Structure formats: structure tokens, C-alpha cells
Amino acid sequence: MASLGVNIDHIANVREARKTFEPDPVKMVLLAELGGADGITVHLREDRRHIQDRDLNLLKETVHTRLNLEMAATEEMTSIALNLKPDMVTLVPEKREEVTTEGGLDVIKNKNKLKEIIQRLSGEDIPVSLFVDPVQAQLENCAEVKAAWIELHTGKYAITKNKARDLELSILKENTAKAKSYGLRVNAGHGLTYQNVEPIAAIEGIEELNIGHTIISRALSVGLSQAVKEMKSLIINPRKDNFLL
């Protein structure tokens, strides 16, 4: 059974829209954990468009589950992670002009850089995950740079329908198995919703799903704890063929 990591970036987005003090994502974490979140995920972007350094420091002290820090593979972010010591670092690609992360890391192209960052973080007992597209060549290189984890990008699956979605689901299943055979542990996320999460949650070998936007959206209607609880129930008892379109 996969666990649930709740991404709280969109709470910070609302706060930063007015450059004020609320809603405070740090205060919302308790509600997410009460709803059943197994971990909390935040992305500290280089432009600080939502999560701020202040948030990270407070989250490190207040998260009772696990803190997963998503970040770009830069010297600035590596130094922050080494000082913070989150429970996990997930390295992601980052472009200032994008609304959200648009694709996986090119591990092949950035192999030496990623290997060096992974060595530094792992040396301080910080597990590192690489956010990658479900492509065999990328997975092979994830293993070669000594990443402990990967997070499979589910964005293409999330935006397709019918036979195209079935194909993307098969690709995710196949590459989860390949990643496991390379000694990698597997998470997944991006674009997952209450309507499409169950087939992904049912994939054998996926350990955690990182989900944010759909949970925060649902929370506007039912509250954050209930929104998390509803998502968790879908992940715990997934139906492999359940697509609610």
C-alpha cells in the first residue's frame, strides 16, 4: 500500500498572492497530518514564489511525519538542505517561467552534477530522490548516480484519457518494475487527482504518492483534514480500473 505525501505549496501560493501572513502553510500541516498524511512535501523554488525559507525552518520543527524537500540541483539549494536536514530531498528540474514542474530531470545530461550533489547529501544521511520521466535510460542513470529513490512523473498519465491513458499506465507499471530491479525505491506524483489516483496507487512497488493541488482544491469545500482523509481512503483501497472523468 502506498503512503501519501501532501504537498502544501498551494497554501503558500494563496499567502504570497497578497504578500501577507495568511494562510500559513506551517499551521496547516497539523490538519493535514490529522487527516492521515504520511508526509509533507514542499518545493523551495529559487524565485521563492510560494514556500519561503522561514517556512522550511518552522516545518522542520513542527512536522510530525516526514518532511520531503523538493528543490533544484543548485549549490544554493544544496547548502540549504545540508543545513536543514529534511527527511528526504527530491531533486526536480526548475524553470522560472513555468507555472509548475513540467517534466522530469534529465539525469543523463546532468549525470556528474547530480552524482556530486547526491554524494554530499547522502554523506549527511539525507536520502535523495530524483524526479524523472518513466523512461528506462533515465532510470538506469538514476541507479548509476547512486540515488536511493526516484519519483516517477505521472503528468502525462494525468492529462490523457481512454486508450492513451491505459498506455501511460502500462508505461508507469513497467518502469516501476524496472526501477525496482535496479535497486531503486519508487515514489510517484504530478497531476494526480481524486478521479485518477486509484490505478496509480494500485501499482505494485510504488511506495508513496505526492499530491498537492487537488487536495488543496478539495479542502476549500470540506476542510484540509477531510480532503486528506478522502484521498488517503482512495490510496488505501484502490480500484485498478477506476477512472472518474
From Swiss-Prot:
Give the CC-aspect GO terms: cytosol
Annotated SUPFAM superfamilies: Pyridoxine 5'-phosphate synthase
Q: Name one GO molecular function term.
A: pyridoxine 5'-phosphate synthase activity
Record pathway:
Cofactor biosynthesis; pyridoxine 5'-phosphate biosynthesis; pyridoxine 5'-phosphate from D-erythrose 4-phosphate: step 5/5
Catalytic center residues: H43, E70, H190
Enzyme class per UniProt: transferase
Q: Where in the cell is it found?
A: Cytoplasm
The positions annotated as site (Transition state stabilizer) read: E151
Instruction: Return the similarity comment.
Output: Belongs to the PNP synthase family.
Its subunit composition reads: Homooctamer; tetramer of dimers.
Q: What is this protein called?
A: Pyridoxine 5'-phosphate synthase
Origin organism is Prochlorococcus marinus (strain NATL1A)
Phylogenetic classification of the source organism: Bacteria, Bacillati, Cyanobacteriota, Cyanophyceae, Synechococcales
Question: Gene for this protein?
Answer: pdxJ
